[in-house]
Amino acid sequence: MYLINAIYFKGDWTQQFDRARTAPAPFQLADGSTAQVPMMQSGDPIRVRAHRDAGLEVAELPYGGRAFAMTIVMPRNPAALDTLLAGLTAEQWDGWVAQLDTISIQVSLPKFSLVNDLSLVAPLKALGMDIAFDCDPPEMADFTRMHRPQEACITNVKHKTYVDVNEEGTEAAAVTSVEIGLTSMPPTIVIDRPFLFAIRERLSGTILFLGAIRNPAGR
């Protein structure tokens, strides 16, 4: 038996990228090499919110009526993303968002797709849910209101995420299954180094999807 929790998001950019302008461009990798990736170009300046400081650039591209947005955080140093992720806090994130200013600017952003599949057993056990995974009576959790007979336990929890970003916008979905048994900005912002992205609801700040792109080409 599976218990399934799913979330789905499909958003069109408020100002879409011109598909005819998408072309291969170099993307700097953490090891100092580069990869050719399909880079989307806005062509005319588009209205985004952005912030830049000595170590990173932050840009927020809105969807539709601007209730949702993709926030991108790109370290200047291509090798610095893992360090940024290791030290990331909610307060730091809120500080970046608070400094965003609305500006009209040309944007270059790589097309990318992200598929991730992982087991959540270890993280859930670390949060104190060990008993749910104990399959030896009499230590088993009581799942009789969900499953008969009583002798049932969770054997695995898998989480799969899919995100596709293109000229029109973003399509994203996540499913969890449980098995029982930018200061003053330059005229252009180019996302051409490893970056962190979040799809979030702007009013509440709720993050729906969070990911890191190290190589959009996936090689």
Locations of regions flagged by a protein language model:
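Secretory/exported precursors with cleavable N-terminal leaders
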Residues: 1-219
